[in-house]
Amino acid sequence: YRGVPTMTAIAKHLAIDMTVMRGTKADSISQQGNRWMAMLDNGETVVAKKMLITSPVPQTMDLLATGNIVLPADKLARLSRIQYEPCIAVMAVLDGPTAIEAPGAISLEKGPISWLSDNLQKGVSKIPAVTIHGSAEFSAHQFERDHMEAGQRLIDIATPFLGTAKVTEYQVHGWRYSKPTVVDDASCMLVSEATDLPPLALAGDAFAGPRFEGAVQSGWAAAKRLMSTH
């Protein structure tokens, strides 16, 4: 699956008629009778009949713990088996075009870099820029260290792919739960099933597959499950 012109275009289209609270974190959630209540970091509260959580499973478990929400043992065991690998990503602006051939992306199986993309070629940037993903091994080794230094190392290693272009500025981001390496067999999980909890479903790429397609299909499956509950 691919969003046009960018991956976020799909979410933006779906959210046209929705109230989306961007830049807002749910600090805690709790059961209030047959409702869910979420306490937000801006001091507001949200009350809902049903809830869907799509964050990485370790973060989801931490959020559920804030409200002392106890999950069935079988579902808890399945969730505990899910594992992720980290990724250190670099977004770099260049002073000229790269040497990356069309269509503008390279996947590498060995070495500290797993992925490079020419964002100008891909049409997601109006100026020369690249995205560099560190490999799982490199990212795990560097994750608790200085990310800017790790980013510079990736840039240095990527130099042959940049041609004569030089990096003028760059940013580094670390995803602790970048890609699931052990996933659940189900497309989603209705954790409230056979409990006194209000309807609560978990979804994401840790269920239907560790790719964007898996996350989308998991979301569809969870929506169907929640819509069928009362």
Where are these regions (language model features)?
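Central helical "cap/lid" subdomain
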Residues: 45-103, 164-165
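A conserved short coil-to-beta-strand element within the FAD-binding core of flavoproteins
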Residues: 22-37
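Short FAD-binding loop at a beta-strand-to-alpha-helix junction that anchors the flavin cofactor
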Residues: 130-131, 188-223
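Active-site substrate-recognition segment that forms the wall
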Residues: 91-142, 148-149, 153-162
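Short beta-strand to alpha-helix junction loop
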Residues: 1-13, 21, 144-153
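Flavin (FAD/FMN) cofactor-binding core of flavoprotein oxidoreductases
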Residues: 152-153, 157-198
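Active-site-proximal substrate-binding core of FAD-dependent oxidoreductases
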Residues: 80, 224-230
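Glycine-centered tight beta-turn/hairpin loop motif at sheet-sheet or coil-to-beta transitions
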Residues: 41-43
